Regions:
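Extreme N-terminal starter segment of soluble prokaryotic enzymes
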Residues: 1-3
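Glycine-rich Rossmann-fold phosphate-binding loop(s) that bind the pyrophosphate
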Residues: 7
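N-terminal Rossmann-fold NAD(P) dinucleotide-binding loop
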Residues: 11-12
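NAD(P)-binding Rossmann-fold cofactor-contacting core
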Residues: 20-51
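Glycine-rich, highly charged phosphate/nucleotide-binding loops
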Residues: 46-68, 76-82
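Short acidic/histidine-rich motifs immediately flanking catalytic phosphotransfer sites
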Residues: 68-75, 92-98
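Rossmann-fold NAD(P)-binding glycine/threonine-rich loop
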Residues: 82-94, 101-142
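Internal alpha-helical scaffold of NAD(P)-dependent oxidoreductase catalytic cores
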Residues: 143-147
Length: 147
């Protein structure tokens, strides 16, 4: 079970790939915008899926409440370098693993993530977005080749 923080271009592409894969479940997307809040992620992306995950806004839903009511195993962060501060402690205290797709962090942000890593797994690579984009492009190409 996966939760997303942020929902930009790369996040939407990865969400689409997850929704199309029956082995994973995208439970929710948590973002600042209130536009289309509580709508189906699949509907928002315009794809067919049996997944019931929804969009939530930080303006109306506390991340602690979301993690308690709809627990996930992983959070994939597509927000910004400061996004980790909005959910990091809540996720770590619940043992939720954090995967950051943020390209650059300041030294103090990295130190904060190391603190979180004492309670949960925190994965971050400065080039993860480049890698994710490559994998998405490769998977699209393979779909065209494979029957």
């Amino acid at each position: 079970m996966i939760g997303f923080i942020g929902f930009g271009r790369t996040g939407k592409a990865v969400a689409t790939a997850i929704l199309e894969n029956k082995e994973f479940s995208l439970e929710w997307v948590y973002r600042r915008k209130t536009l289309l809040e509580n709508r189906s992620i699949a509907e928002f992306l315009g794809i067919e899926s049996d997944e019931i995950g929804k969009l939530y806004s930080s303006e109306h839903t506390a991340v602690e409440d979301l993690l308690d009511k709809q627990p996930v195993d992983f959070i994939i962060d597509f927000s910004s370098s400061t996004g980790i501060y909005s959910y990091g402690k809540a996720a770590a205290s619940r043992g939720v693993k954090i995967i950051s797709a943020i390209s650059h962090y300041a030294k103090e942000d990295i130190a904060f993530m190391k603190t979180l890593a004492k309670d949960t797994t925190v994965f971050w690579s400065p080039n993860i977005t480049l890698g994710v984009n490559f994998l998405l492009l490769a998977s699209k190409s393979l779909k065209k080749i494979a029957p």
